[in-house]
Amino acid sequence: MCAGTRGGDDLVQITISGHPGSGTSTLVHLLCDRRGWRSLNGGDVFRAEAAGRGLPLEEFSRLCRDEPEVDRALDDRLRLEMQAESGPEVIESRLAGWWAHQLGLDCIKLWLEVSPAERSRRILEREGGELSAALERMNERMAADALRYDLLYSISLADMSPYNLQMNTDSMQPDEVADAVEAALESQGD
């Protein structure tokens, strides 16, 4: 069941999820450029809220951990956008596929899988620094996020049941990933 339509199109065409460094943001930019779609990035919502409160990301993450209602309010905002008639066609966040699944949205729910070594390499390329430090930060963030998702929603990121498309992109270039996703969108009859 779709939440609704806009000009005959489903509101949300695709949710894109994956661990940090998996290429979700790159894919979103490519799809939006190719199709003229709009997107909403859960990380951007998180960063904007942190900035609005005058807090660095690490401190805002602690606030979300200590005050779960703050984190829930951000996720509620994403869920509302997913159902809004004027909402974007692409939603990017680690839990977007879960929200679409729970809301019964008829869209592609994509999970990008990438090995820890490749994610670390990509993060290092993007942010610079030392590989060991990048790995440590990535592992700490993933552990903290996994705990938070479990405590808030009883969701395990290891559970892929909400996702109707999973892609391992270790050896794929960004355009190859976008081409494969566009083929999936076409086969679904976007």
What are these regions (language model features)?
Residues L27:
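Hydrophobic positions on the alpha1 helix immediately C-terminal to the Walker A/P-loop
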